[in-house]
Swiss-Prot record:
Enzyme Commission number(s): 2.7.7.72, 3.1.3.-, 3.1.4.-
Source species of the chain: Pseudomonas aeruginosa (strain ATCC 15692 / DSM 22644 / CIP 104116 / JCM 14847 / LMG 12228 / 1C / PRS 101 / PAO1)
Amino acids binding Mg(2+): 21, 23
Biological processes annotated in GO: RNA repair; tRNA 3'-terminal CCA addition; tRNA surveillance
Catalytic activity of the protein: a tRNA precursor + 2 CTP + ATP = a tRNA with a 3' CCA end + 3 diphosphate; a tRNA with a 3' CCA end + 2 CTP + ATP = a tRNA with a 3' CCACCA end + 3 diphosphate
Identification of the protein by name: Multifunctional CCA protein
Length: 410
């Protein structure tokens, strides 16, 4: 029985990065032997055990064989006869197919160390093309390690393109796809994730609404980068630089979907693209069963982001309607995230990344002014029901008028 550290822990140590999770593989042991040593079984599909002291996962060495569609269409075989090399060959990338023995020696049968040096994300074997989830995983690793100079090997990108064309991506469950997408959007370079999916044809299969933005021009005066797809990539880059949460990053990815529906005859203008985009945003949200808070923010950002850009010009009653659309009185954080997403949109433009965005402070100040209006005096006057609601609305409108006048003087 031999125990090896495998996968990400070995990779990240060699890269000089912090090692968080450690996975272990056990060669030459059976399930009965693991149980006899006090390990607790947790694997439903194949033998995985928790260490009795550390709680870390130990998996019996196994092989896998394609037996159906999708990432779940595999038959696994675990036995004491399975070698370490056989276990490593089923892994996706060479940099993830290394092991370390108990003396700290690296076992690297597929050239993972050489690919680390060359900064290449390369598949281990042609079996890579059997698992559609690997398309998303490789794109996610590209987003994680882009800052270190990593790129997807040409032959691996070709296999990813083959998978995209095969229709296998459609076999991925919404939950599994969302798990990979959401993790990738939180990587240091989320725009690289989308770019890689675009380059291999997978974006057209998974989120065709975003794919449709590439090649769609915008007015150069407002968008020096011109291409809407490139703009979305730039906005995601700004999200990462400003450490925005997942909800903001997801909203930014989808905020301009309506531009993909603009007739070529109307290019480069995109009048009413906000409203046109809302049904598309809803469709993408439903496709991946996105968490509610991400769904709601994406929809609102898509519909109202140009309101944010014109915030200083909005009349008090329009500003009040905007605040009410976000239920800013009960959910102030959602409005703050909307403002953040709008600012990322404004900064995600070639050469304008550092420009001021006074609309952010103005909108947050307006929300504060409206929320400062107390309902208590109105209740004490005996107002209730619809009458109370109208009085409260008038009071908030007055507060916003005063706020706008005061800001105008400043």
């Amino acid at each position: 029985m031999q125990i090896y550290k495998v996968g990400g822990a070995v990779r990240d140590r060699l890269l000089g990065r912090p090692v968080t999770d450690i996975d272990w593989v056990v060669v030459g042991a059976s399930s009965d032997e693991m149980l006899a040593r006090g390990y607790r079984p947790v694997g439903a599909d194949f033998p995985v055990f928790l260490h009795p002291q550390s709680g870390e996962e130990y998996a019996l060495a196994r092989t896998e064989r394609k037996s159906g569609r999708g990432y779940g269409g595999f038959t696994f075989h675990a036995s004491p006869e399975v070698t370490l090399e056989e276990d490593l060959t089923r892994r996706d990338l060479t940099i993830n197919a290394m092991a370390e023995d108990e003396q700290g020696r690296v076992i690297d049968p597929y050239g993972g160390q050489a690919d680390l040096e060359a900064r290449l994300l390369r598949h281990v074997s042609p079996a890579f093309a059997e698992d559609p989830l690997r398309v998303l995983r490789v794109a996610r690793f590209a987003a994680r390690y882009a800052g270190l100079g990593f790129r997807v090997a040409a032959e691996t990108l070709a296999l990813m393109r083959q998978l995209a064309e095969s229709g296998e991506l459609q076999a991925l469950t919404p939950e599994r796809s969302w798990k990979e997408i959401s993790r990738a959007l939180m990587e240091p370079n989320p725009e690289v994730f989308i770019q890689v999916l675009h380059d291999c044809g997978a974006l057209a299969e998974l989120i065709p609404e975003v794919e449709a933005l590439f090649g769609v021009p915008q007015p150069a005066a407002h968008h020096p980068e011109i291409d809407t797809g490139v703009h979305v990539l730039s906005v995601l880059q700004q999200c990462a630089r400003h450490r925005q949460p997942l909800s903001v990053r997801w909203a930014c990815l989808l905020h301009d979907l309506g531009k993909g529906l603009t007739s070529e005859a109307d290019w480069p203008r995109h009048i009413a693209h906000e409203a046109r985009g809302v049904p598309l945003i809803d469709a993408v949200n439903q496709r991946f069963r996105v968490p509610r808070e991400c769904q709601e923010l994406a929809r609102l950002v898509g519909e109202y982001h140009t309101h944010a850009h014109r915030a200083l010009e909005l009349r008090p009653n329009t500003l009040l309607e905007l605040l009410q659309s976000f239920d800013v009185y009960r959910r102030p954080q959602r409005f703050e995230e909307f403002v953040a997403a709008s600012e990322m949109d404004a900064r995600g433009r070639l050469g304008l990344e550092q420009r001021d965005y006074p609309q952010a402070a103005y909108l947050l100040g307006a929300a504060q002014a409206a929320r400062a209006v107390s309902v208590k005096p109105l209740v004490e006057k005996g107002l209730k029901g619809a009458e109370l609601g109208e009085a409260l609305k008038r009071a908030r409108l007055a507060a916003l008028k005063a706020y706008k006048e005061e800001r105008g003087k400043a």
